[in-house]
Regions:
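Charged, glycine/proline-rich intrinsically disordered loops and linkers
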Residues: 41-55, 137-153, 242
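Active-site beta-loop-alpha junctions enriched in small/polar residues
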Residues: 25-28, 96-98, 124-126, 178, ...
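Substrate-binding cleft of secreted/luminal carbohydrate-active enzymes
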Residues: 182-242
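Short catalytic/ligand-binding loop motif for oxyanion handling, primarily in non-cytosolic enzymes
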Residues: 30-34, 100-102, 127-130, 182-184, ...
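Conserved acidic residues
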Residues: 21, 117, 202
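Active-site mouth of glycoside hydrolases
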Residues: 1-113
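Glycoside hydrolase catalytic-domain groove-lining segments
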Residues: 65, 69-72, 76, 80, ...
Length: 242
């Protein structure tokens, strides 16, 4: 229904809308762990049925195989729905935050084997330095040196290094989403742009530009405004040319 709905401004269906570049199926998806699924009777029954039908044991290793197939089949099913609706934009599967591969390699294998043309990740240097809930615990990280952070996760396959593995040569890479996270400096956007290019990223989207009307009342993270953060805005323009 979303794909066949008409854009009120252009009169074009979203499936045919030329200003939509990609379809990301789920933003920051998560999946049950083997421990989690045992507390969900319906989902656990599905796994047990799969295990019995495939000669597998009821254990963590077998569940990883089940989850790998589940992720692949879900992506492929959604991919087919999108194509049947007439949309031709690349389909993207999000691999969430850095370190998400740690403990979840089966999810990555499932997406890799799927029909999705692209995979995505998030990039928020400094997020680990602020307690959750982030909005209730703001912290000025402008003077923070992130060089070690970027270097640490570039080659780490459980960080961002998985994006440069040979098996991902057939997948486009994108970033959704990124921000400088409580950092109002002018240097981070250009560094992020160079970092993404080094990882083979072809498209990156920030979350989110702050609208003019409420920008004077907003601050901290997810904050970019030409009038209220001119230094960041200038660096964003520079990053666009990197």
């Amino acid at each position: 229904q979303l794909l066949t709905r008409k854009n009120n401004y252009s009169g074009t269906t979203y499936a045919a809308e030329k200003h939509i570049a990609l379809w990301e199926l789920i933003n920051e998806p998560e999946a049950f762990s083997y421990t989690d699924i045992q507390s969900n009777p319906a989902a656990y029954a599905d796994f047990q049925s799969w295990a019995a039908g495939n000669g597998q044991q009821d254990n963590d290793a077998s569940y990883a195989l089940f989850r790998q197939e589940l992720i692949r089949d879900y992506i492929d099913g959604m991919y087919d729905v999108i194509r049947e609706a007439g949309a031709q934009q690349p389909v993207v599967w999000s691999h969430n935050w850095h370190r998400y591969r740690n403990g979840n390699p089966d999810i990555f294998k499932g997406a890799l084997a799927s029909k999705a043309e692209a995979v995505a990740c998030c990039n928020y240097p400094g997020q680990d330095l602020v307690p959750q809930n982030y909005w209730s615990n703001p912290k000025d990280l402008t003077s923070q040196d992130y060089s070690g952070w970027f270097n640490q996760y570039f080659d780490d396959v459980n960080g961002y290094g998985w994006m440069t593995l040979p098996e991902y040569a057939g997948k486009a890479k994108t970033v959704y989403e990124f921000e400088t996270f409580f950092n109002q400096s002018a240097y981070l956007y250009p560094i992020q742009a160079q970092y993404f290019r080094a990882l083979g990223v072809q498209c990156a989207s920030m979350w989110t530009y702050t609208m003019q009307e409420y920008a004077p009342y907003h601050c901290g993270s997810h904050f970019l405004s030409l009038t209220c953060t001119p230094k960041k805005a200038a660096s964003f323009i520079v990053a666009g040319g990197k």
